[in-house]
Design a protein with these regions (language model features):
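Extracytoplasmic "Venus flytrap"/periplasmic binding protein-like
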Residues: 1-57, 90-95, 99-102, 196-197, ...
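Hinge/lid segment of periplasmic solute-binding proteins
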Residues: 29-82, 108, 217-219, 301-304
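Extracytoplasmic/periplasmic substrate-binding proteins
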Residues: 29-31, 136, 167-253
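Short, solvent-exposed loop/beta-turn-alpha elements that line the ligand-binding surface or hinge
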Residues: 42-58, 123, 143-164, 210-211, ...
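Extracytoplasmic/periplasmic solute-binding protein
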Residues: 69-78, 83, 93, 105-154, ...
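Glycine-centered hinge/linker elements that transmit conformational signals in sensory
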Residues: 111-112, 151-180
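Periplasmic-binding protein-like
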Residues: 255-279
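C-terminal capping/gating helix-and-loop segments adjacent to ligand/active sites or protein-protein/ligand interfaces
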Residues: 296-346
Length: 354
C-alpha cells in the first residue's frame, strides 16, 4: 500500500503537480527524505503562527517516528499501529486451549493443536508488501533489520536470531498448521472461523470486530522467552509538499484539523489505528471512552512503550532493497530454501545496492 503511494507521489512530483499533504508510510521515511523535497514542519508551523504546535501536542518519541537521523522533522505522525495477535476464542475452546499464547513457542504449539484437534488452520502472519511484521519478530528475538558499519547502513538480518524467527514461521507452514497465503485469503480464513490465530496490525481491529462471525479477541505480540518484545510503529505520517506560502499555511491548518481530538477519534474509530497526539487516550472528547470500553484497544495501547522506529532502507535504491526482503519471505515460507541461507544471500544483495 505505502509503496504504491510513494510511487504515485514520485510520479506527481516529476510532473510538477505537487500534492499539498501526503500520507507516507514510516518505512519510507529515509527514502522520501532523500529523494523528495518536502517542507520542514517545524519551520512551516512557525511561519503559520503556531511555532509550538508540535512540541506542545506530541511526545518526543512520537515526533522521532517522522524525523531523519539528523533531526529534521520531515513529517508528523498521524496513524500509529502495532502488531497484535488476534485469535478466535471458539476455535480455542474446541481445541482445549484456555488462554492466549504468550510466547512464540506457545504459538507454534497452539497452531499444531488447533490443526490436529479441529482441522482448522492454526496461524497466519500478514503478508503485505512490506517487512513490518517481520521486523517485529526478528527484533523481538534479539536481531536487527538494519545496522551501521563505518557510518554506512547495511542489512542486519543475516543473523541466527533473524533466521530462527523466519524459520519458526516456515516450520508451521511445513507441518500444515501455518498458512502461507495472500492477506485476503488469510484474513478471510480468520473472519470465517477457519483460522485460529492471525498476527497483523491493530489497524484491522475495527474491520475484524465488525465482520467476524465470532467475538474477536486480541492478545499482545508474543515474546521469545526471556527476550524483550520490540515492535515497529506502523501506520503513516503526514508530509507537506506545497510550493507556495499560502498553500503551505493552509496545509498546516488542515493538519491541525486532522490532529484535533474530535477528528482523531473519528479516524481511530473507522480504521482501528491508535492516535499519536499527547493526551488523546485520556481526553473525554477524544479516545478515552472508546479505549475504556474495548479491551482489544487496551492491549494495543500496552504495546506502545515497546514500539520502535520502522526500519527504513535509505538511498535511491531503498525501494528495491525493501522488495528483496519481501521476496525472500516467500522463498523461506514456501520451503524453497532454509531461512539462514536465504537471508544471508539476500543481505549480500541488499548491501551491494545500499
Amino acid at each position: 500500500m505505502y509503496k504504491g503511494l510513494t510511487q504515485n507521489l514520485q510520479a506527481a512530483i516529476a510532473s510538477g503537480k505537487n500534492p499539498d499533504v501526503v500520507q507516507m508510510g514510516y518505512s519510507f521515511l529515509n527514502y522520501a527524505a532523500e529523494n523528495f523535497q518536502s517542507v520542514n514542519l517545524n519551520d512551516a508551523f512557525a511561519k503559520s503562527g503556531d511555532p509550538n504546535f508540535l512540541k506542545d501536542n506530541f511526545l518526543p518519541n512520537v515526533l522521532e517516528l517522522a524525523q531523519t537521523e539528523d533531526g529534521k522533522q520531515v513529517g508528523l505522525p498521524y496513524s500509529i499501529s502495532v502488531p497484535v495477535l488476534y485469535y478466535n476464542p471458539e476455535i480455542f475452546k474446541a481445541a482445549g486451549l484456555t488462554e492466549a499464547p504468550k510466547t512464540w513457542a506457545e504459538v507454534k504449539t497452539y497452531a499444531k493443536t488447533i490443526k490436529d484437534k479441529t482441522g482448522n488452520m492454526g496461524f497466519f502472519m500478514q503478508e503485505y508488501a512490506d517487512n513490518w511484521a517481520q521486523q517485529a519478530i526478528i527484533e523481538s528475538n534479539g536481531g536487527v533489520m538494519l545496522k551501521k558499519v563505518n557510518g554506512k547502513v547495511q542489512a542486519g538480518f543475516d543473523t541466527p536470531e533473524a533466521a530462527e524467527a523466519f524459520q519458526l514461521m516456515a516450520d508451521m507452514v511445513k507441518d500444515g498448521s501455518g498458512l502461507h497465503a495472500t492477506n485476503e485469503e488469510g484474513f478471510q480464513a480468520y473472519l470465517s472461523g477457519k483460522l485460529g490465530m492471525v498476527c497483523t496490525t491493530i489497524g484491522k481491529r475495527a474491520n475484524f470486530e465488525k465482520t467476524a462471525k465470532f467475538p474477536v479477541k486480541v492478545a499482545t505480540f508474543p515474546e521469545f522467552e526471556g527476550k524483550p518484545v520490540r515492535v515497529a510503529a506502523g501506520g503513516n505520517f503526514l508530509m507537506v509538499f506545497s510550493k507556495d506560502a499560502a498553500k503551505e499555511k493552509a496545509a498546516c491548518e488542515f493538519i491541525k484539523y486532522l490532529q484535533s481530538p474530535e477528528a482523531l477519534v473519528k479516524w481511530s474509530t473507522g480504521t482501528g489505528y491508535l492516535p499519536p497526539r499527547k493526551g488523546i487516550a485520556e481526553d473525554p472528547k477524544g479516545f478515552k471512552k472508546m479505549a475504556e470500553e474495548n479491551k482489544n484497544i487496551q492491549v494495543a495501547l500496552s504495546l506502545m512503550p515497546k514500539a520502535v522506529k520502522w526500519a527504513s532502507f535509505p538511498g535511491a535504491n531503498g525501494l528495491q532493497a525493501e522488495q528483496m526482503l519481501i521476496d525472500v519471505r516467500d522463498v523461506i515460507l514456501s520451503g524453497e530454501k532454509p531461512a539462514a541461507e536465504a537471508l544471508k544471500e539476500t543481505a549480500k544483495k541488499v548491501n551491494d545496492l545500499l
